[in-house]
């Protein structure tokens, strides 16, 4: 033990006390007594609890994961557990091959899809993705069931992405029978690459016949993007009910709204 030693006495009683000169940091204490992935689990838990709070899914119809790129793992909601029963400790730690690293429960059945997106977009392509969400929110699912991209009709949409929200085709019979959830991730990745879409700029997608996935720099930001997707899906549907022949917003308005928030000379908000 390093440190200093104090000596003293009282009458015939002598004592010697050794005091260490180092102390564990708060993070070290948490890792020792609370688990190595405590913070990652907390981030995933808090994001998952936003699904019912933001009305993005009923019952257990959605999941969020939080990614630690340096460690090569992510924390994700356990399969089939109702949101009120979740705790930070119930979040399952999984590696990028889908193997459980820590946790007593089975991870979400959508775990392989999350793993593919992290592996291909965040690791291989270098996209700034720290969280992914999948839900069955009503309006986004409606567009997915129609196998239609969400048109960019207005500035609310353009404030977030400069394109329509892409929708993949259906998975093939072979893909569904082979490895359904993994192939869902592969379909998303191949669809983006075929359209030359940048996952840093287009952070949401619909899977044909299935539903929405969204991602962001953090798990919380992924939830925000999923809420945006649901809202613009609703707005687009209403727009077509009012005017079935409505055309997309002109490019010059799209570019203005997107760049004022995300461009090199962005001026929206407090900086």
Feature roles, as predicted:
Residues 17-19, 25, 29-271:
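Glycine-rich flexible loops
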Residues 2-5:
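Extreme N-terminal basic, low-complexity initiation segments
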């Amino acid at each position: 033990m390093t440190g200093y030693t104090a000596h003293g006495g009282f009458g015939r009683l002598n004592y010697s006390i050794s005091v260490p000169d180092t102390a564990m940091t708060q993070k070290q204490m948490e890792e020792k007594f609370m688990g190595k992935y405590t913070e990652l689990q907390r981030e995933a838990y808090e994001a998952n609890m936003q699904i019912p709070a933001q009305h993005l899914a009923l019952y257990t119809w959605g999941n969020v994961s939080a990614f630690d790129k340096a460690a090569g793992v992510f924390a994700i909601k356990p399969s089939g557990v109702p949101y009120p029963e979740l705790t930070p400790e119930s979040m399952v730690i999984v590696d990028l091959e889908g193997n459980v690293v820590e946790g007593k429960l089975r991870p979400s059945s959508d775990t392989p899809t999350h793993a593919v997106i992290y592996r291909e977009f965040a690791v291989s392509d270098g996209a700034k993705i720290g969280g992914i969400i999948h839900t069955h929110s009503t309006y986004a699912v409606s567009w997915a069931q129609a196998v239609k991209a969400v048109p960019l009709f207005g500035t609310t949409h353009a404030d977030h992405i400069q394109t329509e929200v892409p929708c993949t085709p259906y998975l093939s019979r072979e893909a569904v029978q082979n490895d359904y959830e993994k192939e869902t991730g592969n379909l998303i990745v191949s669809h983006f690459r075929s359209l030359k879409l940048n996952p840093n700029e287009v952070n949401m997608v619909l899977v044909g016949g299935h539903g929405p996935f969204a991602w962001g720099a953090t798990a919380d930001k992924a939830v925000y993007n999923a809420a945006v997707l649901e809202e613009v899906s609703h707005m687009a549907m209403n727009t077509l009910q009012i005017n079935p022949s409505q055309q997309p917003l002109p490019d010059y308005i799209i570019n203005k709204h997107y760049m004022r928030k995300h461009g090199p000379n962005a001026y929206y908000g407090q900086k």
